[in-house]
From Swiss-Prot:
<comment type="similarity">
    <text>Belongs to the bacterial ribosomal protein bL19 family.</text>
</comment>
<dbReference type="InterPro" id="IPR001857">
    <property type="entry name" value="Ribosomal_bL19"/>
</dbReference>
<dbReference type="GO" id="GO:0006412">
    <property type="term" value="P:translation"/>
</dbReference>
<dbReference type="GO" id="GO:0022625">
    <property type="term" value="C:cytosolic large ribosomal subunit"/>
</dbReference>
<dbReference type="GO" id="GO:0003735">
    <property type="term" value="F:structural constituent of ribosome"/>
</dbReference>
<dbReference type="InterPro" id="IPR038657">
    <property type="entry name" value="Ribosomal_bL19_sf"/>
</dbReference>
<dbReference type="InterPro" id="IPR018257">
    <property type="entry name" value="Ribosomal_bL19_CS"/>
</dbReference>
<dbReference type="InterPro" id="IPR008991">
    <property type="entry name" value="Translation_prot_SH3-like_sf"/>
</dbReference>
<keyword id="KW-0689">Ribosomal protein</keyword>
<protein>
    <recommendedName>
        <fullName>Large ribosomal subunit protein bL19</fullName>
    </recommendedName>
</protein>
<comment type="function">
    <text>This protein is located at the 30S-50S ribosomal subunit interface and may play a role in the structure and function of the aminoacyl-tRNA binding site.</text>
</comment>
<dbReference type="Pfam" id="PF01245">
    <property type="entry name" value="Ribosomal_L19"/>
</dbReference>
<keyword id="KW-0687">Ribonucleoprotein</keyword>
Length: 138
């Protein structure tokens, strides 16, 4: 392992120390919570910073695994228009990533969804079996 790889691994472990990044792939529906910082100038001339969180939910149509620069592309339909947004996986702006449902697809990149709408743009849901526990046996 060279020095650049070691530096990237250390940086990734620092950024993921306080948040969990789930395993997801193309076709999964995710909800990404993003931190937004607004700047406003008050009447006395002082600058005021306000933080808020905004949720963005959509289908992952592409995922790029490149170490610290890993990213994923999420597509959603907003007011009848398709909106795509790329998120850096290890960015401090990304507060949390939650998988809403898992999809079944046969491609790694789902760019063909851009040309589809309605029923033809649907993705089948992958059902994950629940592990048997002691409570289920009793």
């Amino acid at each position: 392992m060279n020095i650049i790889d070691r530096f990237e691994q250390e940086n990734i472990s620092k950024r993921t120390a306080n948040k969990k990044i789930p395993d997801f792939e193309a076709g999964d529906t995710v909800k990404v919570t993003v931190k937004i910082v607004d700047r406003s100038i008050e009447k006395d001339g002082k600058e005021k910073l306000t933080e808020r969180f905004q949720a963005y939910e959509g289908v992952v149509i592409a995922k790029r695994n490149r170490g610290i620069t890993s990213s994923f592309l999420v597509r959603k339909i907003s007011h009848g228009e398709g909106v795509e947004r790329r998120f850096m996986t290890y960015s401090p702006i990304v507060h949390s990533i939650d998988v809403v449902k898992y999809g079944v697809v046969r491609r790694a990149k789902l760019y063909y969804l851009r040309n589809r709408s309605g029923k033809s743009a649907r993705i089948k849901e992958r059902h994950i079996p629940i592990a048997k526990t002691k409570a289920a046996k009793a």
